């Protein structure tokens, strides 16, 4: 005999079905919309949060992070951008999920200047980038290769010291000009094989424009409907002109090397092979299984030559400015350098090994002024990812790490606004970003491969400067009155020239 089923028992599977449906809809929707839970300033139609970037974006974003938190969501036009201003968020992006965030967003200006983004710094993640970076790391900027250029660094710093000594007859010198000339000459000899006279080639002006263009915010990349503005403002024409001039210059350099190779006029000076030599050997030989095309060769050269010159100079300029503002730190550095030099007429790179305060000075300058990138070059997620284990971030989202803000975070640094090199004397903080508190060269897969070369130039130049001269500000300028106004491009420079009085020791 069949027992009638109570009517309410029929509701059980209905309730189960409704529960599962609600559970699925709620959690699926929640997962997709979790990014909306990120703190976010109110955005405007079309432009999003672009109006909040200001003339100094690293400072504007730092101010916003103080209100909305160390991880926040902005929109540049319609594109979502995560801004990270904390050690934890930086570590999550550049270490925990480094592979996911290893690509770069497309930039139309960079594309046109670097042969379709065939350089290492801006190339999207993939097999081409792996091969290009491998060439840079193993063949151009290995520790062995960096050491092979020590004679170039020694000769050019000695030349700079001589020129400053000649200029001491006048009461005031422009130290910034000497520092800029130093870095230009060193990197030109290392990358291109010789220095190029500005009147002969105009290369310094071309490179200055190149670096300026790399730092321009191109609204067309974020609001495609406004791409026409670049033609109206003349930006498109300027990019085209600079790209053409750079290409013509690099072609001349490469052809010079090819002709010299045919005549077998190499090594007569005993100098190490320059970057063009190495890249041409790779192109023509079997050192790698990577077919290095002409455009790729030129793009890789641009990375090392153009970007390296500007950032190294800016770091030296900021460091000397900070030391002039802090006479006590300058005196401590001079005492260390002169004491360890032990009466030697010339500082060598071997003498630098025991100069702990020198390294602390450089780290402190890079903490306050991460000239390579106050805002690290944007990364782009290649797939969905959970940020800090909580926020679900969709693929193709950009991430900007505010290295300037992290270097001034009171949770990581005591008295963060004060210049105190002593904080690094017993610290494990490294300029290569291993603990993510100090990020002047980025970190992870997209970290700058030229950090060792840059530090080698900076250390020797600073040591020789404070060994040979006493420095002071011009009469009437107090240390606290030295103008430290910034100007922004792909690097963060001081805006005004560094004028000093140099007295030979």
From Swiss-Prot:
It is a single-pass membrane protein. Its cofactor is heme. Heme binds at residue 448. GO terms for cellular component: membrane. SUPFAM superfamilies: Cytochrome P450. It is found in: Membrane. Belongs to the cytochrome P450 family. May have a role in maturation, such as during flavor formation or other metabolite production specific to aging tissues. This is Cytochrome P450 71A2. It comes from Solanum melongena (Eggplant). The gene is CYP71A2.
């Amino acid at each position: 005999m069949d027992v009638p089923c109570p009517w309410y028992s029929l509701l059980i599977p209905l309730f189960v079905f409704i529960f599962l449906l609600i559970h699925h809809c709620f959690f699926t929707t929640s997962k997709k919309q979790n990014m909306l839970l990120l703190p976010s300033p109110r955005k405007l139609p079309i432009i999003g949060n672009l109006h909040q970037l200001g003339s100094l974006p690293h400072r504007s974003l730092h101010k916003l992070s103080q209100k909305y938190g160390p991880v926040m969501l902005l929109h540049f036009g319609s594109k979502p951008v995560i801004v990270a201003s904390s050690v934890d968020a930086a570590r999550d992006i550049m270490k925990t999920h480094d592979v996911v965030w290893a690509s770069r967003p497309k930039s139309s200006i960079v594309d046109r200047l670097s042969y379709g983004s065939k350089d290492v710094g801006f190339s999207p993640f993939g097999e081409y980038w792996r091969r290009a970076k491998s060439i840079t790391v193993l063949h151009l900027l290995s520790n062995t290769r960096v050491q092979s250029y020590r004679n170039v660094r020694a000769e050019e710093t000695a030349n700079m010291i001589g020129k400053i000594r000649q200029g001491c007859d006048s009461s005031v010198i422009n130290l910034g000009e000497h520092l800029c000339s130093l870095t230009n000459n060193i990197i030109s000899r290392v990358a291109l094989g010789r220095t190029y006279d500005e009147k002969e080639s105009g290369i310094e002006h071309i490179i200055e424009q190149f670096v300026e263009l790399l730092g321009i915010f191109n609204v067309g990349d974020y609001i495609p409907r406004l791409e026409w503005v670049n033609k109206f403002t003349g930006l498109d024409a300027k990019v085209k002109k600079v790209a053409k001039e750079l290409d013509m210059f690099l072609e001349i350099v490469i052809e010079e090397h090819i002709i010299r190779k045919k005549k077998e006029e190499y090594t007569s000076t005993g100098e190490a092979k320059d970057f063009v030599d190495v890249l041409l050997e790779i192109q023509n030989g079997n050192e790698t299984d990577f077919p290095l095309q002409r455009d790729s060769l030129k793009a890789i050269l641009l990375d090392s030559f153009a970007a390296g010159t500007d950032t190294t100079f800016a770091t030296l300029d900021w460091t000397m400015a900070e030391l002039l503002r802090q006479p006590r730190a300058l005196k401590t550095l001079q005492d260390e350098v002169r004491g360890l030099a032990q009466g030697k007429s010339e500082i060598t790179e071997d003498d630098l090994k025991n100069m702990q305060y020198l390294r602390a000075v450089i780290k402190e300058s890079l903490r306050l002024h991460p000239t390579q990138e106050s805002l690290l070059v944007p990364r782009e997620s290649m797939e969905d990812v959970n940020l800090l284990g909580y926020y679900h971030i969709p693929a193709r989202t950009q991430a900007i790490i505010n290295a300037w803000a992290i270097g001034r975070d009171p949770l990581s640094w005591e008295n963060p606004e004060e210049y105190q090199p002593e904080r690094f004397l017993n610290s494990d903080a490294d300029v290569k970003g291993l603990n993510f508190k100090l990020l002047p060269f980025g970190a992870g897969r997209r970290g700058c491969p030229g950090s060792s070369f840059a530090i080698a130039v900076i250390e020797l130049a600073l040591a020789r400067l404070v060994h040979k001269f006493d420095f002071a500000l011009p009469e009437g300028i107090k240390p606290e009155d030295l103008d430290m106004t910034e100007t922004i491009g792909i690097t963060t420079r001081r805006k005004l020239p560094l004028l000093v009085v140099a007295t030979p020791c």
